[in-house]
C-alpha cells in the first residue's frame, strides 16, 4: 500500500494543513519513516506522534514539521497539541474502521504538519490538526479526490492563500467585452463598471494594445484581478515571441490573425500552450478559415469568426459554426462584429460559445446597464451560485 492524503482545516494563525503518506512498513512509506526517524534536520526534527507521553498510536506515525522551528516556544506547539492531535486522529481512525485494525502493525504513517510561528491558541492547534489529520487519512484510504472530481473542481477553485482566481473558459457561453478605445482612463473606468460575472471576458483591443503595449494588461488586472484578459494583437509574424510577451504580462489569451503564415500560427499556439495561456485565431478577412484549420499542427483554443468595424453595415453571416466544431471539437467558437442584443439568441442557437461585443457596450450611456442586459441574455447562472461551500 502507498496512499497519499491532504487536508486543510481551521483559520487564522492556528490553521492546520496536513500532508501524509500511509503504507506498508516494507514499502516506500516504511523507508521514508525510517529515514525520517534517523536523519534529523535542524528546525525540522521528526517526532513520533503520541496521545500522551509513552502512548503512541498504531499504526506508528511520524510527524515532520513543515515550518522551521526556531525556538522552544515554537517547539512546544509541535511537541504538545499537534503531536497529540495527530496521534488521537490515527487512533480514532482505527476505532472507526477507517484504518483496518488487523493491519495496524503492518502500516506506518508519515505526516507533514504545518504550524504557523504565530499560532498561540493550543486548543485550536489541537482541534484543527486533529480534524485535518483524520480527514487526510480518510481521503488517503479512499483515494480522494478521484480524477473526475479533480477535473470538475479544478476550474472552479481558488487557493485561499493566493487570494485571487485564475479564470479558465470551461463553462460557455461567455460575453467578451472588447475595449478598442485607446483612451486608457476611459477603458479602466468602464471596466470598473462591468458587473462581476463568471461569464465575462475582457479584451484589450488592438488600438489599445498598439498605444500602450502589453503593459496595459497589468493596468486592467489592477482594476479586475480575476478577469480573463484577451490581448488582441492580431499577430501576423513572430508568433512565439508575441505569445511569450502576453504570457509575461499575465494575460490569459493572445489573438493571432488567420491571415498569418501557417508556421506563425503554429508557433504561436505552441508557445501559448507552453506558457499556459489560450490561443485565439481571428478569421477577420480570411475567406477560408476551414482550410487554415486543416493545415495547423494543433488547434487553437478559440476560433473567432469576425467581421470588422469597417464592414459591420454590410450583410453578413458568421459562417458554418458546426463545420468548424467538427474540425476542432475542443475549441470554443467566438462570433464578433455586429453582435447586438437582438442577435444574441441567433448566435447562441447557431452554436457560438463566446459573443464578442464592443461599442454596443463600451459606447453605451450606461455601460453597466448594457453589460447586465448582455450578461442576462446568456441565460447562464454563476458557477456554484447555489452551492454551500466548505471544502467540497
UniProtKB/Swiss-Prot annotation:
One MF annotation (Gene Ontology) recorded for this entry: carbon-nitrogen lyase activity
Keyword Transmembrane helix tagged: no
Gene Ontology BP annotations: 'de novo' pyrimidine nucleobase biosynthetic process; carbohydrate biosynthetic process; L-ascorbic acid catabolic process
Classification via SMART domains: OMPdecase (SM00934)
Active-site residues (renumbered): 17 (proton donor)
Keywords: Carbohydrate metabolism, Lyase, Multifunctional enzyme
InterPro entries found in the cross-reference section: Aldolase_TIM (IPR013785), Fae/Hps (IPR020868), HCHO-activating_enzyme (IPR014826), HCHO-activating_enzyme_sf (IPR037075), HPS/KGPDC (IPR041710), OMPdeCOase_dom (IPR001754), Ribosomal_Su5_D2-typ_SF (IPR020568), RibuloseP-bd_barrel (IPR011060)
Signal peptide stretch: none
Region Formaldehyde-activating enzyme: start-end pairs: 1-161
UniProt keyword Electron transport present: no
SUPFAM superfamilies: Ribosomal protein S5 domain 2-like, Ribulose-phoshate binding barrel
Catalytic activity field: 5,6,7,8-tetrahydromethanopterin + formaldehyde = 5,10-methylenetetrahydromethanopterin + H2O; D-ribulose 5-phosphate + formaldehyde = D-arabino-hex-3-ulose 6-phosphate
This protein's pathway: Carbohydrate biosynthesis; D-ribose 5-phosphate biosynthesis
Gene3D superfamilies per record: Aldolase class I (3.20.20.70), Formaldehyde-activating enzyme (3.30.230.60)
Binding site for substrate: 19, 48, 66, 68, 83
PANTHER family reported in the protein's UniProt record: 3-KETO-L-GULONATE-6-PHOSPHATE DECARBOXYLASE SGBH-RELATED
Role played: Catalyzes the condensation of formaldehyde with tetrahydromethanopterin (H(4)MPT) to 5,10-methylenetetrahydromethanopterin. Catalyzes the reversible formation of ribulose-5-phosphate and formaldehyde from 3-hexulose-6-phosphate.
Recorded family membership: In the N-terminal section; belongs to the formaldehyde-activating enzyme family. In the C-terminal section; belongs to the HPS/KGPDC family. HPS subfamily.
Protein name as annotated: Bifunctional enzyme Fae/Hps
Organism: Methanosarcina mazei (strain ATCC BAA-159 / DSM 3647 / Goe1 / Go1 / JCM 11833 / OCM 88) (Methanosarcina frisia)
